[in-house]
Amino acid sequence: MVNLQGSICSLRALEPSDLDVMYGWENEVELWRTSGATAPFSRHQLTSLIAEQQYDIYATRQLRLVIEADIDGEHRVVGAIDLLDFDPQNRRAGVGVIISAEYRRRGFAADALRCVEEYARGVLMLHQLWCSVAEDNVASIALFAGAGYEQCGIRREWILTPQGALSEILFQKIL
């Protein structure tokens, strides 16, 4: 049985009440390089994205799940985990994780990743998950390598920044 409850966090569907926290994440300029964003998101755009989540992943080809944890006796949103570029024919999807700054380094990303892998394998019947990580994103490299993802390629000088070009490391995990 697939359980979206990890040992320290749980995953749930997006709700309209998640708009404010999503607005903060999606408009954090430091994260744009990771997400590929180049401009701010409006509340209207994010409201539409939340509404779109009511549709099946087979229609939208993506799914965002909210990561919740019990913090000081209260259920709090600590992050989100995405399945993206869902490809049911080849039974694979990309995966991405965001944890709010104040909740990082507590194991939430690793626990959420285990949950979404179980969901991907047990419900979506996926064969593999993949991700791409900038070479300077040490925390994400450690997360995916520690979860058994294997480096399967490098895109040299793939991400342009004001400081210069960064390579992107490709990881995949056969489920």
Regions inferred by a protein language model and the residue ranges of each:
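A generic secondary-structure signal
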Residues: E52-Q53, Y119
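Acyl-donor (CoA/ACP) binding surface of acyl/acetyltransferases
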Residues: M1-S10, L14-D18, E26-N27, D72-L175
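Short acidic-aromatic low-complexity motifs
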Residues: S17-D20, Y58-T60
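Short regulatory "switch" loops immediately downstream of catalytic or recognition motifs
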Residues: V66-D72
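Sparse recognition of residues in long alpha-helices and their boundaries
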Residues: T38-A39, Q62, L160, E168
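A short helix-loop-beta-strand connector motif used in the catalytic cores of GNAT acetyltransferases and
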Residues: Q53-V66
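Conserved GNAT-fold acetyl-CoA-binding loop/helix
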Residues: E30-E52
